[in-house]
Swiss-Prot record:
The keyword Nucleus applies. PANTHER family: ZINC FINGER PROTEIN ZAT11, ZINC FINGER PROTEIN ZAT5. Probable transcription factor that may be involved in stress responses. GO terms for molecular function: DNA-binding transcription factor activity; transcription cis-regulatory region binding; zinc ion binding. Keywords: Metal-binding, Nucleus, Repeat, Transcription, Transcription regulation, Zinc, Zinc-finger. SUPFAM superfamilies: beta-beta-alpha zinc fingers. It comes from the Eukaryota. This is Zinc finger protein ZAT11.
Length: 178
């Protein structure tokens, strides 16, 4: 994706063009050679690499080129080692630190770790053990996760609906709720 020119760069360019047009309008006869040199000065490569002095027509092109200076050049021996390291990837396993189960990809291990995290939820001691922890997400039949909160209800009404079910939800007089 190309970066847009800033308003400042655009205004400087417009000022240069306006000055050029004023100079051209004031002269009665412009030599073709002078005009060619003048137009060439605007189209020349104006962004120069400080490392190798190569010039580029856009700042983006210069940025891409400068990145090539940061990459180390591979020798023939290093290319062979890199090729061998690609073979190693197929045999590498990701191991769960909790149950020692192995997985072929880190993404699979991450999904597996979610199972351990959900079983490790610890409730603070000041919360009554009678009130179950309320899951925010539930799985529906197609294994999609859905939000189990009714956004039309207050948080208290949502909690009561979860505890007592939809069949018996006590009516709350909001005058008495702080």
């Amino acid at each position: 994706m190309k970066r847009e020119r800033s308003d400042f760069e655009e205004s400087l360019k417009n000022i240069d063009i306006a000055k050029c047009l004023m100079i051209l309008a004031q002269t009665s006869m412009v030599k073709q050679i002078g005009l060619n040199q003048h137009t060439e000065s605007h189209t020349s490569n104006q962004f120069e690499c400080k490392t190798c002095n190569k010039r580029f027509s856009s700042f983006q092109a210069l940025g891409g080129h400068r990145a090539s200076h940061k990459k180390p050049k591979l020798t023939v021996e290093q290319k062979d080692v890199k090729h061998l390291s690609n073979d190693y990837k197929g045999n590498h396993f990701h191991k769960c630190s909790i149950c020692s189960q192995s997985f072929g990809t880190g993404q699979a291990l991450g999904g597996h770790m979610r199972r351990h995290r959900s079983s490790m939820t610890v409730e603070p001691s000041f919360i009554s053990p009678m009130i179950p922890s309320m899951p925010v997400l539930k799985r529906c039949g197609s294994s999609k996760r859905i939000l189990s909160l009714d956004l039309n209800l207050t948080p208290l009404e949502n909690d009561l609906e979860y505890i007592f079910g939809k069949t018996f939800v006590p009516k709350i007089d909001m005058k008495f709720v702080l």
